[in-house]
């Protein structure tokens, strides 16, 4: 909203700088982030932890983040936190929105020529230009049938292997063409469990290929200590090139030296705890500002907002993927009661029906995500180990009891009342089963307490009621387009079969 209203990205830089100070007080000097994948397929499960669908906006956000965390745009400064931005070269171009942690999501799709240069790489180029400490490579691999890709005139079409094993992407593109000088950190467990495109290689061959391709630091084993004996064995057998090992070791050690890891690796515990306590009020203030500016008024039919009178009767209903959220119901009931509204038990008794709606995807990739608000929708089942359809069906729910929305709306509208929706947007949902029944929709992205990590702050319900009552004007803008239907997003089985055919031909 700041930028759309003539402002800049300073709020993001202030957030990053405050977070940097807290990390520094705790003795933390490297972050496994931040995530700067561009939102392209709205079904992708990691969209909720990135920022935007606009490449230019992503580049500006990335610049602000690096300024705040690293202390500027000329490398890591004293007391800075080195960012390892991810997931290069953009993991969001995924087949049907599947996560690349699973074999169903191993493919990156580029349907148009130079899509990487136009859409996915501007954020990473901004990170390189600001001298980010590190870049994390993604799990997924490019499809053999992708459209032609170049960057600044350089051919970057590559083998169909994951980025950590891909010399074209790490050397030709990232270092030689984009100018990256930091270290490449692979994602976690890339060696054993998620080696897309190199499954036929042994772990010894894989680790040698990673170093030779341009990886410098091998990601952890899901939180377990990293065992580098394989790297030593591969080097002793001549499988890792001398120049590759020298590059990887040098870049890692230089980064540690820049962060004073050797000279001053520890913080005094009491000093650190005192600093954390001192930062709490600053966190509260900034979290409140960010939450306020993020609220988006998506619909206001017949100007039902702002609410002009307190004392009206309100029926509150909560919807999530797993049923009612008791905490949200309690917060809304408290907030409304304190403001003078009367809580009633039936929609037909109310002047206002307030819907608190928070859809979500299932946790695994056993089926294709849908952006529709559905309960127990039968969809094709996928085997996450093979990446193939099983031939069976499974139930998918994104919003339990979704049919009650129409019922509640009909009841309150029959009495001349209105429906107001508080929508927590974790994905670009298709709202055809919600929007027609609502007179007003206010979008939020996270609660104030979730942003701050504290429990005694103003809640998101308090903040939203201030907007609904007109005390605060909503200025936020959606970071992503809400699609009207799923048909334009789906990838056909024929396209995936073409990939398999291409692979079979390559093996032959």
PLM feature spans:
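Glycoside hydrolase catalytic-domain context in secreted enzymes
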Residues: 1-508
């Amino acid at each position: 909203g700041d930028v759309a209203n003539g402002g800049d990205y300073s709020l993001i830089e202030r957030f990053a700088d405050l977070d940097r100070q807290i990390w520094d007080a705790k003795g933390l000097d490297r972050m496994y982030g931040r995530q700067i994948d561009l939102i392209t397929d709205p079904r992708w499960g990691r969209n909720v932890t990135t920022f935007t669908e606009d490449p230019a906006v992503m580049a500006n956000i990335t610049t602000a983040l690096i300024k705040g965390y690293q202390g500027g745009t000329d490398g890591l400064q004293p007391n800075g936190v080195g960012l390892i931005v991810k997931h290069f070269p953009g993991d969001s171009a995924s087949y049907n929105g599947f996560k690349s942690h699973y074999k169903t999501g191993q493919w990156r799709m580029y349907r148009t020529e130079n899509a990487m240069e136009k859409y996915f790489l501007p954020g990473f180029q901004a990170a390189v230009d600001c001298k980010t400490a590190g870049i994390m490579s993604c799990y997924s691999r490019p499809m053999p049938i992708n459209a032609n890709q170049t960057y600044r005139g350089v051919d970057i079409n590559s083998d169909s292997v994951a980025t950590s094993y891909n010399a074209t992407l790490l050397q030709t593109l990232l270092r030689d063409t984009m100018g990256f000088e930091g270290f490449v950190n692979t994602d976690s467990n890339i060696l054993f469990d998620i080696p897309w495109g190199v499954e036929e290689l042994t772990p010894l061959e894989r680790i040698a290929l990673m170093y030779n391709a341009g990886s410098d630091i091998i990601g952890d084993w899901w939180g377990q200590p990293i065992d580098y004996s394989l790297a030593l064995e591969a080097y002793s057998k001549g499988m890792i090139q001398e120049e590759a090992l020298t590059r990887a070791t040098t870049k890692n050690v230089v980064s540690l030296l820049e962060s004073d890891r050797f000279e001053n690796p520890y913080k005094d515990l009491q000093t650190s705890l005192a600093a954390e306590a001192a930062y709490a009020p600053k966190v509260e203030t900034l979290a409140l500002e960010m939450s306020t500016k993020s609220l988006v008024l998506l619909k206001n039919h017949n100007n039902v907002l702002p609410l002009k009178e307190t004392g009206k009767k309100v029926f509150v209903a909560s919807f999530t993927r797993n049923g009612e959220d008791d905490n949200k119901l309690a917060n809304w009931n408290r907030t409304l009661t304190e403001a003078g509204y009367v809580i009633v038990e039936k929609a037909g008794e109310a002047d206002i029906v307030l819907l608190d709606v928070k859809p979500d995807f299932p946790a695994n990739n056993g089926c294709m995500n849908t952006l529709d608000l559905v309960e127990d929708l039968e969809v094709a089942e996928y085997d996450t180990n093979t990446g193939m359809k099983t031939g069976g069906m499974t139930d998918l729910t994104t919003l339990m009891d979704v049919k009650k929305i129409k019922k509640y709306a009909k009841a309150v509208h029959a009495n001349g009342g209105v429906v107001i929706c508080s929508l927590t947007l974790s994905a670009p949902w298709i709202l055809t089963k919600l929007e027609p029944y609502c007179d007003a929709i206010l979008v939020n992205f996270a609660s104030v307490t979730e942003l701050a990590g504290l429990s005694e702050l103003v809640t998101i319900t308090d903040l939203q009621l201030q907007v609904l009552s007109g005390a605060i004007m909503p200025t936020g803008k959606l970071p992503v387009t809400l699609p009207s239907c799923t048909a334009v997003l789906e990838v056909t089985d024929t396209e995936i079969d073409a990939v398999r055919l291409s692979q079979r031909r390559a093996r032959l």
